[in-house]
Amino acid sequence: YVLKTNYSNNQKSHEEMILEKKASAYCTGWKEKIEKLQKDDLVFLYKTGTGIIAYGFADGKLKKKEWDGVIDDEYYMQLDNFEILKKPLDAATMKLVAKKGFSFRSTMFSIDEESKDLIMDEIRNNYL
């Protein structure tokens, strides 16, 4: 999965995802996307306008907490084996490496196994 870090809407949420090593989404209509994650799903954290900045593997345990004064308005999962990239992997490089386009309009979107593997190879070879 590719999960946008909400940077353009709220820098605090972006920073929390990195510091707390978690995949989060906020508010009805978006937060429910986190429910799709299964244990050991690979999640790339994507900062809008920058690229993939980190990744980890979902622990499979959905958690909820208060966000901006609203009870259970943040859904999240911890990310195991969390890694922060030395430099962001931008959208153009993602598309080039995977040999396909991605739509970044959604908060979170799935990518196929082959694309995931190609992007991970690129990260391991050039971004860690």
Enumerate the predicted regions with their spans.
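Contiguous surface segments at macromolecular interaction interfaces
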Residues: 1-5, 9, 23-29, 67-128
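Short, polar loop/linker segments at the starts of domains and inter-domain junctions
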Residues: 12-24
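Short, well-ordered loop/turn sites that connect or cap secondary structure elements
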Residues: 36-38
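Short beta-strand-centered aromatic/proline hotspots
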Residues: 52-62
